[in-house]
């Protein structure tokens, strides 16, 4: 298994795809997706465009759908939810489909959606992603951070490093595909005992603090707290494995 890390979807190779893509948006899309599926959502359907989200979700009965929209960290008017994983309670999610569009994570999913296998990961379900990769042993793995509007994201890179670090420790056979893997592991090891402190330091974490999302940051920092793996059933649709 050869692992590559790309800090943003824009940095991935253009004319090829991996055997398995792991998409990360720690703050907060992939944390929310994992939480929604763990809480009983039937599926999570992702959109980069809010207008398309509204059109597609309109074809569903209101009691069977939830719309989650976020731009710049804030909830989009007309949606039921923003992008807070804390809103994904079993009472709200059970049996419903979550239609979601976020600033960054949904764009990263779009870039790799034609890969044979697409999964999503965050700090909270890191080990579930690692277990899947160790079990399936895909030849090539891309771990793709969502970044922020095309730029580098500290927390996504640290999460990618957390996955690569665990793969290396637990298998001993992971091949390093690019230098970003080495750098990401080093970054994760620097912050592994203070993930919340890292979230408070990084630019997107500070953005969320200004929006009074302190509890979201605490939740997103709970590494290996959920044993759930979102996997793509068809392009843009994720289900619980």
Curated annotation (Swiss-Prot):
InterPro entries: ComB-like (IPR005238), ComB-like_sf (IPR036702). Keywords: Hydrolase, Magnesium. The keyword Nucleotidyltransferase does not apply. The keyword Hydrolase applies. It catalyses: (2R)-O-phospho-3-sulfolactate + H2O = (2R)-3-sulfolactate + phosphate. One of its GO terms (molecular function) is sulfopyruvate decarboxylase activity. It comes from the Bacteria. Its cofactor is Mg(2+). Pfam families: 2-ph_phosp. It is an enzyme of class 3 (hydrolase). Its EC number is 3.1.3.71. Belongs to the ComB family. NCBIfam families: PRK00886.1-5. This is Probable 2-phosphosulfolactate phosphatase. It comes from Microcystis aeruginosa (strain NIES-843 / IAM M-2473).
């Amino acid at each position: 298994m050869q692992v590559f890390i790309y800090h943003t979807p824009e940095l991935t190779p253009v004319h090829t795809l991996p055997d398995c893509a792991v998409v990360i948006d720690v703050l907060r899309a992939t944390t929310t997706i994992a939480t929604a599926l763990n809480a009983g959502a039937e599926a999570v359907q992702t959109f980069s465009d809010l207008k398309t989200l509204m059109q597609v979700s309109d074809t569903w009965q209101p009691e069977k759908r939830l719309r989650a929209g976020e731009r710049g960290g804030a909830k989009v008017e007309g949606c039921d939810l923003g992008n807070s994983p804390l809103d994904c309670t079993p009472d709200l999610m059970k049996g419903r489909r979550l239609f979601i569009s976020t600033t960054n994570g949904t764009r990263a999913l779009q870039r790799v959606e034609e890969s044979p296998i697409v999964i999503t990961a965050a700090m909270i379900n890191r080990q579930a992603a690692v277990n899947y990769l160790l079990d399936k042993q895909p030849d090539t793995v891309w771990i793709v951070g969502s970044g922020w509007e095309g730029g580098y994201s500290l927390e996504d890179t640290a999460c990618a490093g957390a996955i690569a670090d665990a793969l290396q420790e637990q298998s001993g056979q992971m091949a390093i595909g690019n230098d970003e893997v080495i750098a990401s592991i080093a970054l994760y090891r620097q912050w592994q005992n203070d993930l919340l402190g890292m979230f408070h330091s990084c630019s997107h974490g500070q953005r969320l603090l200004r929006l009074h999302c302190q509890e979201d940051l605490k939740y997103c920092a709970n590494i290996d707290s959920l044993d759930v793996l979102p996997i793509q059933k068809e392009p843009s649709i994720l289900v619980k494995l």
